[in-house]
């Protein structure tokens, strides 16, 4: 693999002139934070946000950019080849951040074909269109879960992929598609594998907002299995900073681990949140825990080394103490941001809410109307 320092001339070239950046899944959690950072860091660049407005996305995530002239929202499906081809033909995209994905692991066991369709087939549609359009960089967001788990050995970018659930399998398949364009065409791709990301505005199917929502409703934190499985947690601002750094100076054709310094067992995570949210004593912590049936397959750990990112100059800046404080505060102040609905109804409810918000969003009339 190439030395990241070899891409320094490319950094200068990238910063010349205005660019048009496409973010797929931009109304979702990480995508919306990324768009906001790009808008601040590169105020003259155009940002095109393509999102299908699935249940875990919301136009509220980017309400602050509604009246920004350089920002365009377009509703559409990345699996729709006609839509994507038309998008690249009409929008003059320079850089792609592919964040769109089905990512809820439990759902992947129920709907494995849907996960493979969106995460792998959708990526292939994007790759073909981006390649034909000659974009400058295609940055694909993958996951540490493609490695499978490990109790002791830390994974680096050369470690073999051993995905253990339909979600991580679909992401590994998409990675292979992305890398094949580099191997065959030298198409300028970069792949990232990140730890669990958390922070404000994350939908409550993920563990931290899920626990916070349950505690706000005076319900117990539901823990799958023993709760001894641990995760590394990375604050959302740190992942978006890493993505921009890779856009600016990442080596083409490379994979980058974006790992967190902080690891915690899920049972301990729940206890920490109970202590803060419910102001509980140590003797009361476990009264707020409810152990439920585990996933069909549950990985214990995803330990990664991020030396390649560190050599580029990136390291996490937001400590766990500060990040979780900000996150708890946001959810306490935004209790009705995400509607509280049962799992079976969440898709329909969120899509209905997004439909109403869509009428207020700023869209590009010449293109968006045909995409809706």
Regions found by a protein language model. Give the residues of each.
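C-terminal substrate-binding subdomain of Rossmann-fold SDR/epimerase-dehydratase oxidoreductases
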Residues: 2-6, 13-14, 76, 215-372
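Hydrophobic alpha-helix immediately C-terminal to the catalytic Tyr-X-X-X-Lys motif of short-chain
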Residues: 173, 177, 181, 211, ...
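Residue-level recognition of oxygen-bearing side chains
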Residues: 83, 114, 121, 203, ...
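Short beta-loop-alpha junction of Rossmann-like oxidoreductase domains
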Residues: 149-151, 200-202, 206, 308
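Active-site loop immediately N-terminal to the catalytic Tyr-X3-Lys motif
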Residues: 112, 192, 204-205, 250
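N-terminal Rossmann-like NAD(P)+-binding domain of SDR-like oxidoreductases, especially those catalyzing
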Residues: 1-197, 237, 326, 332-372
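A short, amphipathic alpha-helix embedded in the catalytic core of nucleotide-handling enzymes
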Residues: 38, 181, 210-214, 242-246
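Proline-centered turn/helix-capping motifs that create local helix->coil transitions or kinks
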Residues: 139, 151, 186, 202, ...
């Amino acid at each position: 693999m190439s030395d990241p320092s070899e891409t320094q001339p490319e950094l200068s070239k990238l910063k010349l002139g205005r660019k048009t950046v496409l973010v797929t899944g931009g109304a979702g959690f990480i995508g919306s934070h990324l768009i906001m950072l790009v808008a601040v860091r590169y105020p003259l660049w155009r940002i095109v946000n393509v999102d299908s407005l699935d249940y875990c996305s919301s136009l509220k995530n980017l309400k602050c950019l509604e009246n920004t002239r350089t920002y365009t929202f377009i509703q559409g499906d990345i699996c729709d080849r006609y839509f994507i081809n038309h998008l690249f033909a009409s929008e003059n995209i320079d850089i792609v951040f592919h964040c769109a994905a089905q990512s809820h692991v439990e759902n992947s066991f129920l709907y494995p074909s849907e996960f493979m369709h969106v995460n792998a087939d959708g990526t292939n549609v994007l790759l073909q269109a981006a390649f034909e359009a000659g974009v400058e960089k295609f940055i694909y967001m993958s996951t540490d879960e493609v490695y499978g788990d490990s109790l002791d050995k830390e994974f680096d970018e050369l470690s073999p992929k051993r995905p253990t659930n339909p979600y991580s399998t679909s992401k590994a398949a998409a990675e292979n598609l992305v890398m094949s364009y580099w191997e065959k065409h030298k198409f300028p791709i970069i792949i990232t594998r990140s730890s669990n990301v958390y922070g404000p505005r994350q939908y409550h199917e993920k563990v931290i907002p899920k626990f916070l929502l349950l505690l706000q409703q005076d319900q117990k934190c539901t823990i799958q299995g023993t709760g001894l499985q641990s995760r590394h947690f990375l604050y959302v601002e740190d992942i978006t900073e890493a993505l921009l750094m890779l856009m600016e100076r990442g080596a083409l054709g490379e994979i980058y681990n974006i790992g967190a310094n902080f690891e915690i067992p899920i049972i301990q995570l729940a206890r920490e949140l109970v202590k803060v949210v419910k102001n509980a004593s140590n003797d009361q912590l476990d009264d707020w825990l409810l152990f439920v049936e585990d996933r069909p397959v549950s990985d214990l750990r995803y330990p990664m080394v991020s030396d390649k990112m560190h050599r580029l100059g990136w390291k996490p800046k937001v400590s766990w103490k500060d990040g979780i404080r900000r996150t708890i505060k946001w959810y306490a102040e935004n209790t009705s941001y995400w509607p509280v609905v049962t799992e079976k109804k969440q898709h329909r409810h969120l899509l209905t809410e997004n439909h109403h918000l869509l009428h207020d969003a700023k869209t590009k009339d010449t293109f968006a109307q045909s995409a809706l």
